[in-house]
Amino acid sequence: CILIYKNDMLMIKKEHLVSDISKLKKVYNQSFPWLVTLAEESENAKYFKDALRSLILSWLTEKESTQENVGMAVARRILLLIEHDDTFVDELSTGERLPVRTVTYLWQFLTGHLENEVSPDLFIDLYHQFDLLEHPVEILPDRALVKRQMSRWPTGLDPEVIAIRERNKERIIACLIKKIERRHSPSSRFQFAEGISYEEKEARVREWWNTARFHLSMAIKSPTELNFFLGYSLSDETMSLLARAKKKGMPFFVTPYYLSLLNIEHEGYDDATVRSYIMYSNELVDTYGSIKAWEKEDMVVADEPNAAGWLLPEGHNIHRRYPEVAILIPDSMGRACGGLCASCQRMYDFQSERLNFDFEALKPKESWDRKLRRLMRYFEEDAQLRDILITGGDALMSQNATLRKILEAVYKMAVRKRKANESRPEGEKYAELQRVRLGSRLLAYLPLRVTDELVGILREFKEKASAIGVSQFYIQTHFQSPLEVTPEARHAIEAILAAGWTITNQLVYTVSASRRGHTAKLRQTLNALGVVCYYTFSVKGFRENYAVYTPNSRSLQEAREEKIFGQVPEEKQAELYDMIRNQRPLGKCLVRFLKENGLLFAGTDRNVLNLPAIGKSMTFHTIGLTSEGKRILKFDHDGSRRHSPIIDQMGEVYIVENKSVAAYLRQLKEIGEDVNEYRTIWNYCEGETEPRFSIYEYPAYPFKATDRMTNLEL
């Protein structure tokens, strides 16, 4: 399928991909006869590059007087491709040394001398760059269009969606009754008394349904059970794939609650974004067992610095990339999750079984209390750490007693660190704890976990910690779709906000989530409940995530054409900051603020890629394309935040995207999208990291802290 845009008209030629080269050559002949002639008159690729460079430079000189910014940007883009052609780059995520031959391939293609198998996707991308050079198009975001695109996506609070899910719940309850009847687990609290009627069993399951422990106990753990609970609606192809996954040892874990969010009816809502989170792809199953850690700093070796230069305690409890923040993964049920996300960034840890769903084995041992005290000393004795992110797995998977102990240990550590600073002079004082975060997807996966007792623990900790200088308390959650925002999720969100914590959302920008208007609708839906958005993450690019991978160009397109209608005016940001920190009920306050300022939502999130060992950034240039048409991006780190000094020792950072733009558009077409709505995607070949919203900045200290870094070895 060749995807060519010409004068805003989409021409789709239905041919097999491998046979499209000749047809694509005819398109070049018709559209760019000058380029074909230039190639044919060049003896080799070097002469072609020299001639093309001279032509582009001459064109640039002519255009400088006209201030034609779009065309000039494209011209510089093509010059970058020429500059990097016939070079090698070290790809950061894989460590491979890769040749860059973009313009050489173009010359071979135009002269009929392709030496290697090269995908048409490469030449489709280049076609659009030359088309933009000749016909630059100024992108004008359309608010009315974005509103229409947002209206496509229902939420879990819509009456029609709730009605379908009530029917799902009835079906699943019937399945649960059969499951409990077949179980032989005398120790389980979820069993039926002898001789009770079906109606009594049904009433008991309805009662249990409202407790998180029931859903975890009854989680679906096999493909056949999954199909049973989904009314035998899975295809033979899907069942075969899931059977292969099980044979390879991939864990399955889906709660009845989350399963009730799927739609197995022929009518009703599109559940692809939710479904793709629990259904595995061929690529994921193929690579499971050989998946590598994308987060290179997560690979910890005793007495050796990690990839970011930080020395860490032995084991896998503390992960660190930046000077100010470290992640704590407790030895508890927090190493499990409420479900296994198919695009999980820690799939490597599930593969190694450091993260798993064996709840009994994950319960804290007596030695954990001692270990926790030792881990807290790391935070206490570090000169720069002022932010702790407790995650996993999932922080809220820890039992209440365990979570209370962890938070108490954090509190005592913060007290000691503050006390120690009293004897340190100005300029030598250590960073004190200012921010505590709990990373959890349970607000989407299993909001029933948010009980009165849990809320009480959060409220009590905030009150105590606020008195010793901790001022930021965040639940860092992960809603992927507005369909996950259910009445149960709303109740959980309201309870946590009432306890004084802020809830921030991180989205993974999968293919289904990247559809026009989808992310904008999610922001709007969350804002209405008082949740503020934090990051929109590009999917990390190893092969296991090929099926869900969205190119960074689409993320940039979303930010500049959709998220722009949630851009908070600079003069209003202080008001929004105060509202998020202090005003309740936050949802109603946010809705009023958005309406008063003509915003569709609050676009407080940053669209970024998490780079191995370096951190979050969207500052890059496209310097080439692989033979498969995948873009080769040259990244720079986010200059707006502090990094490990190792950043100064690292060379240039190159990342190869997981999928070509053309392949992504074909995938969108296969799931029913009108790809004409995405036609400006080819314009986005370079990015710049967005500024951070003020609520995500650390507050200033009332003293001068040291610049010295401890626990660092370069």
Residue ranges and their predicted role:
Residues I4-R321:
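Flexible, acidic/Gly-rich N-terminal and inter-domain linker regions that tether
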Residues E15-E40, I56-L60, E64, E91, ...:
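Radical SAM enzyme [4Fe-4S]-AdoMet core and its adjacent flexible, acidic
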Residues V254, A559-L714:
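C-terminal accessory regions of radical SAM enzymes
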Residues V254, W310-D349:
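N-terminal pre-triad scaffold of radical SAM enzymes
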Residues R320, D331-R335, D349-E360, G439-S440, ...:
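Catalytic or ion-translocation cores adjacent to nucleophile or general acid/base/metal-coordination motifs
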Residues Y322-A326, L340, D382-T391, Q434-G439:
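Glycine-rich, often proline-containing surface loops adjacent to acidic residues and nearby aromatics
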Residues A336, M347-I388, A401, K405-E408, ...:
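Conserved alpha-helical substructure of the radical SAM core
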Residues R373-E380, L396-V568:
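Conserved AdoMet/S-adenosylmethionine-binding subsite of the radical SAM
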